[in-house]
């Protein structure tokens, strides 16, 4: 069976995180576990982490922060109310109050100050559109543009309007400090608007000397506009199509997704496509044809990872959803072409990326069975992956956290590895590991890429040899 290269992220909730369940997901193709802090307590998140590590210490854990989001307060009437077209609804600046019919309150106390007349306020991912037709002190006067049910704690989006919220909330900070102690691998920060939004998180990580990597969730037009700067300060990007599809017109989502993936590829950064990939499988055992095509198109576009949210967190068919993604990936990847395009202006280590490109090019002309590299940082793996080699790629990782970070990179299978004296020992020891697993055998031509064994950091040589 063709081993898939696209990585799969599964959202797991603490009310369904037993060891057996996680093992099933892992054995069917899951590479990364996602915990959504918006719906988790610290105790619940720790339970997920503990059970994940019982299954394996080789795959990564990612935690989402809430970021600068606005929500409705709780509803005075638990069932909410129906907003009818052309009704007038007031949005009042008082986060301590409960919403009721005709009056809404949000978690942000300065809506009236920040939101101008003429704006659209979208409730619950756009289910209800409120047009701002007037404002008074501490109050917005809105007209209901379409009928819908409004319930408490639902999302509030104001497209093309800057809301002056802090980039990192107090709850985010608690989860970040917990993530450092719990040895989490990735922090996916929500609603990243600019590189400045990442700096506060990085300062916390640096103060703790943490290896955690930041994933920027692009969820609004500001994030799209500032993507190039954002990519400088993060490990990778998540295309979070849920809020993004509310903040910008839905018909632009495919184009924005394509452009974000292209930008990440140029910068050699992992990119995740998320939200509603197999949405119907929350309730049905089989996906729609459109969903299958959506997953395949993400892979065609060169996404490193694809993500399940509700499908695995609370859906009726979580294991089937992972199996489905795996099958789509296996089928699609067999048609991918090697892509040797390279722009050296956008890479940190030009020598390493040129070596990686040359080694992948060699697989087009010679019967190379596998590519192998050793790494402290995983950077060479990201470089090799960008060119989409057809042959398997194996990483020998000197740090366990680097091994887990590569769980997010297309086509890389990572192994823990011990320090060696020189490149001959590196080749011999890695061959032994891969032969024992049946990945390669005597007589195979294998490509190696690595660095000098000393102070210089980064790949400095490539080698092809028969084993």
Where are these regions (language model features)?
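Non-catalytic helical/linker scaffolds that mediate oligomerization, partner binding
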Residues: 1-467
């Amino acid at each position: 069976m063709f081993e898939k290269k696209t990585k799969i992220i599964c959202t797991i909730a603490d009310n369904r995180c037993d060891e057996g369940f996680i093992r099933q997901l892992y054995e069917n193709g899951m590479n990364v576990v996602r915990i959504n802090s918006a719906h988790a307590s610290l105790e619940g998140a720790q339970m997920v982490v503990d059970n994940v590590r019982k299954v394996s210490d080789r795959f990564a854990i990612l935690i989402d922060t809430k970021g600068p989001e606005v929500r409705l307060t709780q509803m005075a009437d638990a069932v909410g109310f129906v907003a009818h077209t052309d009704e007038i609804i007031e949005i009042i600046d008082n986060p301590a109050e409960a919403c009721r019919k005709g009056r809404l309150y949000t978690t942000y106390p300065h809506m009236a100050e920040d939101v101008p007349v003429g704006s659209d306020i979208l409730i619950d991912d756009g289910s209800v559109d409120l047009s701002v037709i007037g404002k008074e002190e501490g109050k917005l006067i809105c007209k209901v543009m379409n009928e819908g049910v409004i319930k408490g704690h639902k999302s509030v989006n104001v497209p093309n309007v800057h809301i002056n919220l802090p980039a990192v909330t107090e709850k985010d900070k608690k989860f970040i400090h917990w993530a450092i102690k719990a040895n989490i691998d990735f922090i996916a920060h929500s609603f990243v608007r600019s590189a400045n939004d990442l700096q506060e998180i990085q300062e916390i990580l640096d103060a703790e000397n943490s290896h955690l990597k930041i994933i920027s969730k692009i969820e609004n037009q500001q994030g799209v506009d500032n993507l190039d700067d954002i990519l400088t300060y993060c490990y990778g990007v998540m295309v979070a199509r849920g809020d993004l599809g509310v903040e910008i017109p839905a018909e632009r989502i495919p184009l924005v997704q394509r452009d974000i993936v292209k930008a990440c590829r140029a910068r050699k950064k992992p990119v995740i496509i998320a939200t509603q990939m197999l949405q119907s499988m929350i309730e049905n055992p089989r996906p729609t044809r459109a969903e299958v095509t959506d997953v395949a198109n993400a892979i065609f576009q060169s996404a490193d990872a694809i993500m399940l949210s509700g499908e695995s967190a609370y859906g009726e068919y979580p294991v089937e959803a992972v199996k489905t993604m795996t099958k789509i990936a296996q089928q699609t990847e067999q048609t991918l072409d090697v892509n040797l395009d390279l722009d050296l202006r956008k890479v940190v280590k030009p020598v390493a990326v040129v070596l990686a490109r040359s080694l992948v090019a060699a697989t087009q002309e010679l019967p190379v069975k596998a590519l192998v590299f050793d790494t402290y940082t995983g950077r060479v793996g990201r470089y090799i992956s960008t060119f989409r080699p057809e042959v398997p790629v194996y990483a020998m990782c000197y740090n366990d956290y680097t091994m887990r970070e590569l769980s997010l990179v297309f086509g890389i299978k990572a192994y823990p590895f011990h320090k060696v004296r020189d490149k001959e020992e590196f080749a011999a020891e890695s061959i032994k590991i891969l032969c024992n697993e049946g990945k390669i055998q005597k007589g195979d031509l294998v490509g190696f890429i690595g660095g000098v064994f000393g102070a210089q950091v980064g790949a400095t040589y490539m080698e092809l040899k028969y084993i």
